[in-house]
Amino acid sequence: VTCGVVPGLMMFVLFQNIQEDSTSVYYLTEEYFYMGFVPYLGFFITLASCYRLAKFNIDTRQTDSFIGLPTPANALVIMSIPMIQYSNDYEGLTTVLYNPYLLLFITAISSYILNAEIPLFSLKIKEFTWAKYKMQILFLIGSLFSFSLLGFVAIPLIIISYVLVSVISNKMMAKA
C-alpha cells in the first residue's frame, strides 16, 4: 500500500510546490483555466496503484513475470523526481521537472502503465542458468552501470528501459 500512497502524495506535493513557486507556465494557464485542483490529480497514481494491487492479488498469470509495472518500480520513478530536482547536478533537467504539464503527463503514463496488459520480465531467479536468465543479468549489469554514472537520474531511465526491453523481448518471442 505504501508504494501506492507515497507516490500519489509526492506528486501532490510536487504540484503544490509549482503553485507556490509561481512559475510563469502555471500562471499563464491559470488565467484561462482554474488550476487549483491540479495537485489532487497526483492521487490518480494512488488510485491506479490500488487497482493494480487488487488486480494483482487475483491474477494467476503473474507467477513468473509481471503484467503491468509493479507498484514499487512505479514508486521509484515518482520518488526519483524530487531527488533529481534537489540534487542540482542537472540544472536543465531540474527546470524541466518543474513543468506542471510534464508532471501531468508522468501522472497519466504512470497510472496507465501500472495496469497495462504488458508482460514484464521478472528479476526472480529460481535456478541460475545463463541461457535462461541472460536478459535479466545483462539488464541488472546495465542498470548498475547506469546508476553509477548518472545517480538518481538513472532511476527513471532504468524503469523505462525495463518496460522497453520487456516489450521488445515479448515481440521477439511472439515472432519465434
Predicted regions and their residues:
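Multi-pass membrane catalytic core of lipid/isoprenoid biosynthesis enzymes
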Residues: 1-54
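C-terminal membrane-associated helical module and adjoining short loops/tails
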Residues: 63-176
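Homeobox/homeodomain signature
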Residues: 43-46, 56-59, 105-110
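Contiguous mid-protein beta-loop-alpha structural module that forms a pocket-lining wall or clamp
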Residues: 52-58, 63-65
